[in-house]
């Protein structure tokens, strides 16, 4: 099993290019199932989760060709309505094929998902939404069985905004008869990116980026050629790295309009931030100031940046309070950070972080995707050597992370048995 070894204490400087957003690419690739031709996507990151969705689409009958960051999906031959456990178990986002299959084939049999250790992440929202659009739903032997000769428009309301739920039901509603309204919809940029793609395909969707989305169903959708938006979480990870190491990093192929919650908080820590079009420069301050953070749905501070920001606060001056409101069990990384000398106390969904003079390198184990990134960041600022195991989590969501850090001056390497 691969490990990453980091020698800490180096100031990071230079330029890094941000990859395409995994969380935008996954639903957009799944939306290919709604067309009867070849879609072309550029700026697609080369990640384990992307490979998983490509394997699943191939199993369903799609033909996929890849060249660099370009992926072509020919969905004209899709005729298989079953997504089996051996494929779905690799990644929770595999549930994104459920609604496109029902919309296109009239039925779907999709294994209940796996792939992430963060809380329960229920799919109830997806199923209730499909039922509201006329689908028959049954849970049998670990599978979701959904069928509807033709989906019809319905009224859907989320008790809590669900990104994947919103995306799945958008794809169902795009080909449904009549009008569908989604209330308390997720507003994340990845949702808006999917809507942009669906509308380019010929869908009629309004309200993306707001809590109220209206979809007027159309008879069919056409193939498109589109580029995947930049990854705002990867961007945030490098911004934190600059502040953490008191470095000077220029980040290209970014989308600052997606980063307000992160940019505001980072500026409060004392980092100097310059934004010029799609380029962000972050210069770390002499002192890292402690700030409080509460994770919230977009445009609030993203839960996917909580672990990385906690590392920054672990070496800040003073006490910071980090409140996690999106997922339960998202402080799994704390025990590993404490092994490195971080002073963190957990109470329910709140972490109290007392800034320490320094962190110390130690053997640590990654528990999920963003926890993996936080441990790499901790290793960059720690005294001595940090050895991170179970880094396969990292490969699910970061493209060539250690190589990018190495080009910025970090002493970091991957060790393969």
UniProtKB/Swiss-Prot annotation:
It comes from Desulfosudis oleivorans (strain DSM 6200 / JCM 39069 / Hxd3). GO terms for cellular component: cytoplasm. It is found in: Cytoplasm. PANTHER family: UDP-N-ACETYLGLUCOSAMINE 1-CARBOXYVINYLTRANSFERASE. Keywords: Cell cycle, Cell division, Cell shape, Cell wall biogenesis/degradation, Cytoplasm, Peptidoglycan synthesis, Pyruvate, Transferase. It is an enzyme of class 2 (transferase). GO terms for biological process: cell division; cell wall organization; peptidoglycan biosynthetic process; regulation of cell shape; UDP-N-acetylgalactosamine biosynthetic process. The lineage of its organism: Bacteria, Pseudomonadati, Thermodesulfobacteriota, Desulfobacteria, Desulfobacterales. This is UDP-N-acetylglucosamine 1-carboxyvinyltransferase. It comes from the Bacteria. It catalyses: phosphoenolpyruvate + UDP-N-acetyl-alpha-D-glucosamine = UDP-N-acetyl-3-O-(1-carboxyvinyl)-alpha-D-glucosamine + phosphate. Pathway: Cell wall biogenesis; peptidoglycan biosynthesis.
């Amino acid at each position: 099993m691969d490990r990453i070894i980091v020698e800490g204490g180096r100031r990071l400087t230079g330029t890094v290019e941000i990859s395409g957003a995994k969380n935008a690419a996954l639903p957009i690739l799944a939306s290919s199932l709604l067309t009867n031709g070849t879609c072309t996507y550029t700026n697609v990151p080369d990640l384990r989760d992307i490979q998983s969705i490509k394997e699943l689409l191939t199993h369903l009958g799609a033909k996929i060709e890849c060249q660099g960051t370009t992926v072509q999906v020919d969905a004209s031959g899709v005729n298989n309505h079953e997504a089996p456990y051996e494929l779905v178990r690799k990644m929770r986002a595999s549930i994104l094929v459920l609604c496109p299959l029902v919309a296109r084939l009239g039925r779907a049999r999709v294994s209940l998902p796996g792939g992430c250790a963060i809380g329960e992440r229920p799919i109830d929202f997806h199923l209730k939404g499909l039922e509201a659009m006329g689908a028959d739903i049954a849970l049998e032997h670990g599978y979701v069985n959904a069928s509807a000769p033709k989906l019809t428009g319905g009224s859907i309301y989320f008790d809590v905004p669900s990104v994947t739920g919103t995306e799945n039901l958008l794809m169902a509603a795009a080909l449904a008869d009549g009008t569908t309204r989604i209330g308390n919809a997720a507003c994340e940029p990845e949702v808006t990116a999917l809507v942009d793609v669906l509308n380019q395909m010929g869908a009629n969707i309004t309200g993306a980026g707001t809590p109220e989305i209206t979809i007027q169903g159309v008879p069919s959708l056409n193939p498109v050629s589109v580029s995947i938006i930049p990854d705002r979480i990867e961007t945030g990870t490098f911004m934190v790295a600059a502040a953490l190491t008191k470095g000077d990093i220029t980040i290209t192929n970014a989308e600052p309009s997606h980063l307000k919650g992160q940019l505001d908080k980072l500026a409060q820590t004392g980092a100097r931030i310059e934004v010029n079009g799609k380029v962000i420069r972050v210069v770390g301050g002499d002192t890292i100031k402690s700030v409080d953070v509460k994770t919230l749905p977009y445009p609030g501070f993203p839960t996917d940046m909580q672990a990385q920001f906690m590392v920054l606060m672990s070496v800040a001056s003073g006490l910071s309070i980090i409140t996690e409101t999106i997922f339960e069990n998202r402080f799994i990384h704390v025990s590993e950070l404490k092994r490195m000398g971080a002073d963190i106390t957990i109470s329910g969904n709140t972490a109290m972080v007392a800034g320490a003079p320094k962190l110390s390198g130690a053997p640590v184990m990654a528990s999920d995707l963003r926890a993996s990134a936080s441990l790499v960041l901790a290793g960059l600022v720690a005294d001595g050597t940090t050895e991170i195991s179970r880094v396969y989590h990292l490969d699910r969501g970061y493209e060539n992370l250690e190589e990018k850090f190495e080009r910025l001056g970090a002493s970091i390497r991957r060790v393969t048995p």
